[in-house]
Amino acid sequence: MTQQLQQIIDAAWEDRANISSSAAPAEVRDAVEHVISELNNGKLRVATRESVGQWTVHQWIKKAVLLSFRLKDNEQMQAGSLGFYDKVPTKFSHLSANELKESGVRIVPPAVARRGSYIAKGAILMPSYVNIGAYVGEGTMVDTWATVGSCAQIGANVHLSGGVGIGGVLEPLQAGPTIIEDNCFIGARSEVVEGVVIEENSVLGMGVYIGQSTPIFNRDTGETSFGRVPSGSVVISGNLPKKTKSGQEYSTYAAIIVKTVDAQTRSKTSLNDLLRD
């Protein structure tokens, strides 16, 4: 079934210029709808984890998400008292009280999750936004004004602090999703974008910005890397010294790995079980 779906989606992607809400084969519509539905219930994911820091990205699923926008027109929608004009309905608006209880998710107004995202049991959505294709793991807190971008992968027992931005893949188009692995703490107003991977058990301090071109400097080893924070790292924002060709000194922004996570760090960033009953 999955292989057949992939073949239909890949073929439709190559012919996407000729696909619209009024012109698309039924098998393409059905295939795209099936993918969105499976993303919505967590049976499909844009990326799957093989080991720490190692992920397989399923490009055909991302293509299906993009094709879904071509297959629908904007329409007026209602989710409770929230009115909007869009192509994608919200995730929870049609659920009954019992269905919401069974989901195990707590949703604080005016949090919004789009259909096609998955929110696992025990997760908490404070007033925040989760885009289509995203995956939010068990016990994760998406705090106030945090945003989880399209197709982003957020692990279990993660804390996304207030105002955190996790980048999406749809615009600008990215090769792979931004990934925050299990048991990470992302400090307030931090931004992780452009398919960067934050490996498990890491802590980002407040106001850390990491994209693919951001130098990630390890204070202990002196090494500089890009696009990935190693497991168990504690990262703060900082600067690295540079020189112009004429010898003039200046500095550029960098993310600095200052140490590995220890008991003191954990005591300051541990999740509160009282909020998850």
UniProtKB/Swiss-Prot annotation:
<dbReference type="InterPro" id="IPR011004">
    <property type="entry name" value="Trimer_LpxA-like_sf"/>
</dbReference>
<dbReference type="InterPro" id="IPR037133">
    <property type="entry name" value="THP_succinylTrfase_N_sf"/>
</dbReference>
<dbReference type="GO" id="GO:0009089">
    <property type="term" value="P:lysine biosynthetic process via diaminopimelate"/>
</dbReference>
<dbReference type="Pfam" id="PF14602">
    <property type="entry name" value="Hexapep_2"/>
</dbReference>
<dbReference type="InterPro" id="IPR005664">
    <property type="entry name" value="DapD_Trfase_Hexpep_rpt_fam"/>
</dbReference>
<comment type="pathway">
    <text>Amino-acid biosynthesis; L-lysine biosynthesis via DAP pathway; LL-2,6-diaminopimelate from (S)-tetrahydrodipicolinate (succinylase route): step 1/3.</text>
</comment>
<keyword id="KW-0457">Lysine biosynthesis</keyword>
<keyword id="KW-0220">Diaminopimelate biosynthesis</keyword>
<protein>
    <recommendedName>
        <fullName>2,3,4,5-tetrahydropyridine-2,6-dicarboxylate N-succinyltransferase</fullName>
        <ecNumber>2.3.1.117</ecNumber>
    </recommendedName>
</protein>
<comment type="similarity">
    <text>Belongs to the transferase hexapeptide repeat family.</text>
</comment>
<feature type="binding site">
    <location>
        <position position="143"/>
    </location>
    <ligand>
        <name>substrate</name>
    </ligand>
</feature>
<dbReference type="InterPro" id="IPR001451">
    <property type="entry name" value="Hexapep"/>
</dbReference>
<keyword id="KW-0677">Repeat</keyword>
<dbReference type="InterPro" id="IPR023180">
    <property type="entry name" value="THP_succinylTrfase_dom1"/>
</dbReference>
<dbReference type="Pfam" id="PF14805">
    <property type="entry name" value="THDPS_N_2"/>
</dbReference>
<feature type="binding site">
    <location>
        <position position="106"/>
    </location>
    <ligand>
        <name>substrate</name>
    </ligand>
</feature>
<dbReference type="InterPro" id="IPR050179">
    <property type="entry name" value="Trans_hexapeptide_repeat"/>
</dbReference>
<keyword id="KW-0012">Acyltransferase</keyword>
<keyword id="KW-0808">Transferase</keyword>
<dbReference type="GO" id="GO:0005737">
    <property type="term" value="C:cytoplasm"/>
</dbReference>
<dbReference type="InterPro" id="IPR018357">
    <property type="entry name" value="Hexapep_transf_CS"/>
</dbReference>
<keyword id="KW-0028">Amino-acid biosynthesis</keyword>
<comment type="subunit">
    <text>Homotrimer.</text>
</comment>
<dbReference type="GO" id="GO:0019877">
    <property type="term" value="P:diaminopimelate biosynthetic process"/>
</dbReference>
<keyword id="KW-0963">Cytoplasm</keyword>
<dbReference type="GO" id="GO:0008666">
    <property type="term" value="F:2,3,4,5-tetrahydropyridine-2,6-dicarboxylate N-succinyltransferase activity"/>
</dbReference>
